[in-house]
Amino acid sequence: GIPTCGETCTLGTCNTPGCTCSWPICTKN
């Protein structure tokens, strides 16, 4: 749940390991 991935997921996917999409940004925990 923490937006520390530095990645966006406007297409719905995250490439960073351990990160999930909380549109429109990737979050971790």
Swiss-Prot record:
InterPro entries: Cyclotide, Cyclotide_moebius_CS, Cyclotide_sf
Keyword flag Cell division: no
Post-translational modification: This is a cyclic peptide.
Superkingdom assignment: Eukaryota
Cystine connections: 5-19, 9-21, 14-26
Sites of the Cyclopeptide (Gly-Asn) crosslink: 1-29
Keywords noted in UniProt: Disulfide bond, Plant defense
One GO term of the biological process aspect: defense response
Annotated family: Belongs to the cyclotide family. Moebius subfamily.
Free-text comment on this protein's domains from its UniProt entry: The presence of a 'disulfide through disulfide knot' structurally defines this protein as a knottin.
Primary role: Probably participates in a plant defense mechanism.
Protein name: Cyclotide mden-A
Organism: Melicytus dentatus
